[in-house]
C-alpha cells in the first residue's frame, strides 16, 4: 500500500501557507488509547496485534465530518512514505523494529493521523499550522468520541483513560507547541522564562538529540492525569504566548546592540549552506535558523517572498527531499545520498540571499 500522489501533494501544500505566528508556527495534539477488551501492547502476540489492527481500521470508514482516511500497514509501505508522514505530523516515533501489526491511518485533509500498535493500541494525532488550536483539538476529541463509541477504550473512574505508560493516563492527551526562538536562545534569556514548577517540559525537535536544533523549543505537558484538556491547553498557550512576546522583544534588543559576534554567526551560517557539498540535518536546521534571524534583523538581503524558514523546515527532512527531488521509482534514503541532495537544494535556495554591507 502506498500513498496516492494527490494526497502527498496535499500534505506538502498544507505547510506552504504563511503561518499566523512565525514564532509559534505549529501545535500538535495526541490522544493515547487502548481497547478495554485487550491487554497492553507489550503483552500481545503478533496474531493478537493483527486482530487489533483489523478491528480498529474497520471503523475508519465513513466518519461524518472527517472525509476519507487511508490505511497504510507499515509492513507494506515504503520506508520513505512512512518517514514522510512522521515528518509531516512531527511524530517522535522510531520506525526501527518489526512493523507486523502496525499501521498509520491518515486523513486526506492532512490534519489527522492515527498510529495503531505503536506504543498503545491507538494514538490519535492532530496538527495545526494556522493557530486554530481549539478547533484542531475539538475535532480530535470528536474523532476520539466516535471511535470510543465503536471500540470501547479502557477507562478507569480513578485513573481516566488507561495507557501503557502510566504518565499518560487521565485524559491521555499530549500537546506540543513548537517555538522558533533564536533570539532568546542566543541571548540566554530562555531559561529565565520557564517556570520549573509549572507542569510543562521542554524538549528537542529531533528524537534523541540534546539541545535545541534549529533553535526550536518544543513545549509539552508533563502529564495528563487529573487535568482537563482545556486546562492543559490553557497552560501551554500561556507559556507559548509569553515566549512569543519575549522573542520579539529579544530580536529588537539584538538589532539595537548590533553585535559583531552575532553577525559573524549569521554570515558563517550563510556560507555553510552556500558552499557545502554535504549537509547533515541538525547543522542545516541551525544554519537556517540563524539566517532567518539575520533576515529578521535586516542583516541579510532577501528576494521577495523567499521561502527560507517555512516550508524549508520540512523540505530539508530526508523523506520530503526524497519525494520532491528524486524520481518516483528510485527514492533513496541512504545517508550520503540525502546529505548530498540536501546540500544541493540549499545551495540553490540561498542564491537569492546576500549580506548587507557591514
UniProtKB/Swiss-Prot annotation:
Which key words are in the record? ATP-binding, Kinase, Nucleotide-binding, Transferase
Does Transferase count among this protein's keywords? yes
Q: Which reaction(s) are listed as its catalytic activity?
A: L-arginyl-[protein] + ATP = N(omega)-phospho-L-arginyl-[protein] + ADP + H(+)
Q: Does the keyword Heme apply?
A: no
InterPro entries for the chain:
Arg_Kinase, ATP-guanido_PTrfase, ATP-guanido_PTrfase_cat, Gln_synth/guanido_kin_cat_dom
What's the EC number here?
2.7.14.1
What GO terms describe the biological role, i.e. biological process, of this protein? phosphocreatine biosynthetic process
Cellular component terms per the entry's GO annotation: extracellular space
Q: Name one molecular function that GO assigns to this entry.
A: creatine kinase activity
- What role does this protein play? Catalyzes the specific phosphorylation of arginine residues in proteins.
**Similarity annotation:** Belongs to the ATP:guanido phosphotransferase family.
**What name has this protein been given in UniProt?**
Protein-arginine kinase
**Organism annotation:** Chlamydia pneumoniae
